Amino acid sequence: MKAVIAIDSFKGSLSSFEAGNSAAEGIRRVYPDAQIEVRPLADGGEGTVEALTLGCAGQLTTVTVTGPLGKPVSCQYGIVDSTRTAIIEMSGAAGITLVPDTERNPLYTTTYGVGEVIRDAITKGCRHFIVGIGGSATNDGGAGMLQALGFGLLDKNGNPVPFGAMGLEVLDKITTDNVLPELKDCTFRIACDVTNTLCGEQGCSAIFGPQKGATPAMILQMDKWLAYYATLAREIFPHANPKAAGSGAAGGLGFAFMTFLNGTLESGIKIVLEETRLSDYIKDADIVVTGEGRLDGQTVMGKAPIGVAKIAKQFDKPVLAFSGCVTKDATACNREGIDAFFPVLRNVVSLEDAMNPVNARQNMADTAEQVFRTIRSEEHTSELQSHSFISYAVFCLKK
């Protein structure tokens, strides 16, 4: 029996590989000789660097960069030497989790550190970039990142504008004289599932500004500044489009990537599934196991487990899902390729106990064991004509 396991991380508890290896442990208790492939999974958000880097046989590295508040932070990113690819999460350098609640103010938070990570990767030989841009603390339109890469964002006196959205208030000119020359040879794939525009009622300031600490007055100001920033950008890059879907992602970082770096915005799960070649592993599997920390109605909206299920169904494979929490509307997942799903919690516990990594690993392994015991039992008792999921799975295992 061959099982392919691709489970997204249980945020704050288990990484993708930890969750997958725990499920594999449970399966091996029942099928000691099973061939099990544990593959990394992420959707472009938290855990993408580790999942993609390890899934592509790369190495993790760490660099100290300027954090969102202007203070040094340590940022981990991945390098795949064979393809000269860097895998980056902007949240590692400019994420909202790096800013205490009492200090959240998008007028001053910067993406400068994101540019420093890119610059570091370029010096290490990378020319291809995969960047996840979720979880930002910023609303500077990517201005800080561009400054770190050599773009001149200048005020009327020719001085660099200050960090943060506040710098856009005094922005008068954008120059490209000192841009890193290597950038012309670089490609950028941006993992982004946000469709908001740069400005307007559905723009980054209005929609995401409040959670970053913006007041209503700040939102109006930042929206106006970003609009003028886009106008200046269009003078140099005619393709600049502040109305493009995703241009408002990460406080306008999406706009900066598309406009200044010719980046393409793509579904996060699409990038991960392609880069890790998951379909190559699933095509000759007998059963596929996926999951995430919380399985609910939103899972069907482009989340990682559904991406796995869709690939599995291309090859007519049965799909199981394990999750820390399962809501009533998770049944929507059954219509999108997940044949059956199971919560791994065995009793009512506190959130702290449920997320404890030791408990989570044990719960995952124990649940997987019991589910696969049922499958093994059905091998001896079920008729192949039965229409139950378990019999369907057994039938596939016997093929």
Question: Residue locations for each model-derived region?
Answer:
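N-terminal loops that bind phosphate or other acidic moieties
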Residues: 1-133, 137-377
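Single conserved hydrophobic/aromatic residue that forms the stacking wall/gate
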Residues: 378-399
